[in-house]
Amino acid sequence: MGVIEFLLALAQDMILAAIPAVGFAMVFNVPVRALRWCALLGSIGHGSRMILMTSGLNIEWSTFMASMLVGTIGIQWSRWYLAHPKVFTVAAVIPMFPGISAYTAMISSVKISQLGYSEPLMITLLTNFLTASSIVGALSIGLSIPGLWLYRKRPRV
């Protein structure tokens, strides 16, 4: 993939990630003045995950690093705009949730219950379930670490 193709794919990824970030921000009753920042943070998070995955990291570690970046930026923006960090961060990480892995695991479990046990279905179920669980864990831990680190009262060392 050339540089131009990568930049176009990155721009497309970031624009498409901003749409569900704004949608979920509206569902969570985020103030109107913060909607554009939720969209920007959602696209920054998803774009950084794409860059990390393109550079060779797997999806779990890329999601962890991207959610840490989203948490850090959200804390800084909350200080600037006098809002809680969750106003910006929660809606911004939702586009990174593992919908395809969770859906594939669910479909595999339904097929196992209908057709009976088969090893390929069980491998598909476990692989996708563990991938989805790891991504959700990476999102939650990565989003909480910047708050634990930056709001710490005692010395870090």
Swiss-Prot record:
Membrane topology of this protein: Multi-pass membrane protein
Function as written in the Swiss-Prot or TrEMBL entry: Involved in succinate export with YjjP. Both proteins are required for export.
Transmembrane segments: 8-28, 50-70, 87-107, 129-149
Recorded family membership: Belongs to the ThrE exporter (TC 2.A.79) family.
GO cellular component, one term: plasma membrane
UniProt record, GO biological process: succinate transport
Disulfide pattern: none
Major subcellular site: membrane
Pfam families, per the entry: ThrE_2 (PF12821)
Encoding gene (name): yjjB
Organism for this UniProt entry: Shigella flexneri
Name under which the protein is recorded: Probable succinate transporter subunit YjjB
Record keywords, A-Z: Cell inner membrane, Cell membrane, Membrane, Transmembrane, Transmembrane helix, Transport
UniProt subcellular location: Cell inner membrane
Subunit structure: The transporter is composed of YjjB and YjjP.
